[in-house]
Amino acid sequence: MSQQPLPLFGFDRLTLGLYLALVAIGWLMIFAVNYNPEAPYAFFDLSHMAGKQLAFMVICFVMMFVVMLSDWSFWRTLALPLYLVSILLLPGTLLFGREINGAQAWYHIGGFTFQPSEIAKFGACLAMAAFLSSPGIDLRQWRDRIIAFSIFLIPAVLVLLQSDTGSALVFFSFLLVLYREGLSPVLYALGFGTAALVILGLKFDPPSYTAAWLIALVNYLLINRLRERKRLWWAVFVALIPLTIWWMYPLRWLLGELEVSLPEEQMHLLVLMPHILLFIAAFLPNYWKKNSLIQGQMRVWLVLLSLSVTLIFAANAFFNLLAPHQQQRIKIWLRPKEAASEARGAAYNLLHSKMAIGSGGLLGKGTLEGNMTKLKYVPEQSTDFIFCTVGEEQGFVGVIGLVGIFLWLLWRITILAERQRSNFSRIYAYSVAGIIFVHLVVNIGMTMGLLPIIGIPLPFISAGGSSLIGFSLMIAVLLKLDSNRNLA
């Protein structure tokens, strides 16, 4: 018996309802941030932030209606052309775009601005789904891996050239999709390990102490494998711990007695010497064992340790090459004491963001009653920091409710993904879920100081037509594909 399509507009009503709820909450929060008691109905004015958002909401609803009237196969057939068009829009901002908050990522059209990276995310979802669902694709093959990575790395690099680090980071959400489709977990372990080493290199300055503790950890593992004179080995290992902590005091005294002057950087590097010597002494007895398997393991350890130490120093050196405002954002996240002296800028934003969220208490101050919202203590509160308004006016209960709706939506999208008969539809659904998830985690994390301030909107909530159109288009196509799942 042939499969029949679901009735016209037989879309998943729960997903649509969650989408509409988030859009409505977002508009209410934007209205609250920009509320003026002297002009309570200004939201009908397109010069008002809430008025603009209302206009974009109407555009999105019309767009979703048009998508539901389209043929479901249209989106797979034109996946590559739509992706290429979205990619071609990105470099144009470097020539014809407008710079906002240090990022030249917007086109200015009439009285509105348009951010092509939001559409590029949608295009990348289609392209990734089309590629991975093609016959013969196997992520165990390096050729297919390279193509899959290129699909999201190309727009990520182009967006990074616009100085929009936050939007570039979002494209790495496709790693979640690739994991679901069978990419080796070993690559993710290496990726997370690399990220951890980079964070350590950025957090601790000078990096020589971080490298010293890393070598000490490897020394512990090496000594634990030895069988002879273990007490002597452990005695030396334990003695190096206080020496690492207080190394600079005896070193400065010794150099003073010898009347030798060294730059501060070189003095810090000397802390590595005893750990390196112990590593060599513990490494050689393990390597000399007449066992090819053990020798192979030792070589791997040596290579990984060398790369790890190099990466720590490289991350620290890269930090020193960043622009001052980029360094400040990292300091706010990883070195808060060092950044505490900043009265304005990112430190100011984060301080007042946390104050606004905390001042809401359990139940919040009430809609339109947020003092910090009214007095504009937090810049960009309609866009990147709109979560502060939720925390201040709706309190802990409101925050939990909003996050709960997001998690419910993500859970529902995964349900839709798993019930698809088409690989294209399933992969597309997971791509959409991954992008929303990364936006949610990064936006809330940065407003609470858990992640660096990189400036990405909260989906469906933050003001901005490009963001709302991009996410609405993702949801609309998902609903369309799901409503025709019986045809796959």
Language-model regions: role of each:
Residues 2-19, 50:
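N-terminal membrane topogenic signal
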Residues 359, 423-430, 483-487:
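Membrane-interacting alpha-helical segments
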Residues 16-31, 38-344, 388-446, 473, ...:
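Hydrophobic alpha-helical transmembrane segments of multi-pass inner membrane proteins, especially
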Residues 1-3, 236-245, 442-488:
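A juxtamembrane structural motif centered on a specific transmembrane helix
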Residues 342-344, 357, 361-394, 424:
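Long extracytoplasmic/lumenal interhelical loops at the membrane interface
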Residues 111-123, 161-163, 361-366, 453-472:
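Glycine/serine-rich anion-binding loops at beta->alpha junctions
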